[in-house]
Amino acid sequence: MPAASTAATTLLQASQSEVLGEIQSNFLLNSSLWVNIALAGVVILLFVAMGRELESSRAKLIWVATMLVPLVSISSYAGLASGLTVGFLQMPPGHALAGQEVLSPWGRYLTWTFSTPMILLALGLLADTDMASLFTAITMDIGMCITGLAAALVTSSHLLRWVFYGISCAFFIAVLYVLLVEWPADAEAAGTSEIFGTLKLLTVVLWLGYPILWALGSEGVALLSVGVTSWGYSGLDILAKYVFAFLLLRWVAANEDTVTQAGMSLGSGGAAPADD
């Protein structure tokens, strides 16, 4: 028993190089990070080429927002692969892995905090939504990511982990409401409803996978290993970010006139004109 306690202490005080060694020894975890880094690099080059012919400021703004998604991802995944944003956490009593030290790639939450608002910004611009609705969606999204990080890092109480998880899901419901209820009408008025509907469905379905993975992974009930969970997150990121962004930019490049005519200012609101 004392030996186990000593080992636990060593893990908790592990240096960055030791964490890196642990990552590299886990093939599933390590490969899930480097595959994403490689794809992000390819996507960045592709998006640069796709945006070269854009002329209108609105189309360029959508391009910049979309471009930031792989830029944030490659930076964040590099932090994960280097061990910079990964650490060991001792799970609290009541957790399936109570008393054990679990490798926590908490840097993923940094990726989501900075990249998912850009996805929503691009979608909001595409739908020509009003500033208030766009601000609501982005702030709710940031709240979702931050409370998700809290749920992953809390080790003082197993109950509190799930409390933060519930709060994060509540923020997520607010984001879903905006995407499913408010913005479709704006997109219809802006003439972008067809592509918006496709991207909305892709986003909603894939984003629902993240809280499910959290609950099933080592942070939740621990039915999935860290490596399997990491591949799940990486797969969702590839589809929800890179595939989403490619579909959006391809449509914008082919329909720049529609994007330009959708609205000349962010605060115009595509669904209804402002009262005089």
UniProtKB/Swiss-Prot annotation:
Residue stretches spanning the membrane: 26-51, 58-81, 106-127, 131-154, 158-180, 193-216, 226-254
Sequence ranges on the Cytoplasmic membrane side: 52-57, 128-130, 181-192, 255-276
Record carries keyword Transcription: no
Cellular compartment(s): Cell membrane
GO CC list: plasma membrane
Primary localization: membrane
GO annotation terms (biological process): phototransduction
Keywords: Cell membrane, Chloride, Chromophore, Ion transport, Membrane, Photoreceptor protein, Receptor, Retinal protein, Sensory transduction, Transmembrane, Transmembrane helix, Transport
GO molecular function: monoatomic ion channel activity; photoreceptor activity
Positions of modified residues (N6-(retinylidene)lysine): K241
InterPro entries (UniProt xref): Arc/bac/fun_rhodopsins, Rhodopsin_retinal_BS
Annotated CDD domains: 7tm_Halorhodopsin (cd15243)
Matches recorded under SMART domains: Bac_rhodopsin
Proregion positions: 1-21
SUPFAM superfamilies per UniProt: Family A G protein-coupled receptor-like
Pfam families the UniProt entry points to: Bac_rhodopsin
Record bears the keyword Acyltransferase: no
Membrane topology: Multi-pass membrane protein
Residue intervals annotated with topology Extracellular: 22-25, 82-105, 155-157, 217-225
Similarity field: Belongs to the archaeal/bacterial/fungal opsin family.
Function: Light-driven chloride pump.
Protein name: Cruxhalorhodopsin-3
Taxonomic source organism: Haloarcula vallismortis (Halobacterium vallismortis)
